[in-house]
């Protein structure tokens, strides 16, 4: 049941403060699927899409993999260009019913696309709608385990 989001086009959205185990949980969830997966920090994906970027990280490859893990959504500088690139990746996966696991320090939910503390405020209403469709959200809490 915990991996039921795999059956649809949904995402597994993991949010929480720094150091609460979001990345660790995301990779464990991807491995638990038993399917091929790719893991990339969002900033690296965006850097790779710029001219002269890493040719191994292509939109086609990100769209085709069974499960994609995008780490630290919202850490990128929000521009129209980054919003367009992220939307193209998420939308293509959504259209092809491919699950995506996403980690973020931002809060899930919210009803305003103008509050940057919420994921919707950081990525915009259009992208957030795709992420929310059929998704499971999980908010982690606690102290930064790397500082303990």
Regions found by a protein language model. Give the residues of each.
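Walker A/P-loop nucleotide-binding motif
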Residues: 8-26
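Residue-level preference for the first positions of well-ordered beta-strands
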Residues: 11-13, 36-37, 67, 99-101
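Structured helix-beta-strand junction loops
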Residues: 8-9, 64-65, 96, 134
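Short basic/glycine-enriched coil/helix segment immediately N-terminal to the Walker B
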Residues: 57-66
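Short secondary-structure capping micro-motifs at structural edges
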Residues: 25-30, 52-58
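Pre-Walker A adenine-sensing motif
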Residues: 1-7
């Amino acid at each position: 049941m915990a991996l039921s989001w795999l059956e649809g086009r949904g995402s597994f959205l993991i949010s929480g403060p720094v150091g609460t185990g979001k990345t660790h949980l995301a990779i464990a969830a991807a491995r638990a699927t038993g399917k091929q997966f790719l893991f990339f920090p969002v900033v690296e994906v965006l850097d790779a899409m710029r001219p002269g970027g890493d040719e191994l990280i292509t939109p086609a490859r990100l769209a085709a993999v069974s499960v994609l893990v995008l780490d630290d959504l919202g850490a990128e500088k929000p521009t129209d260009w980054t919003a367009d690139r992220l939307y193209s990746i998420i939308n293509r996966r959504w259209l092809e019913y491919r699950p995506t696991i996403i980690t973020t320090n931002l809060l899930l939910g919210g009803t305003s696309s103008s509050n940057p503390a919420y994921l919707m405020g950081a990525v915009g209403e259009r992208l957030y709608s795709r992420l929310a469709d059929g998704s499971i959200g999980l908010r982690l809490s606690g102290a930064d385990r790397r500082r303990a």
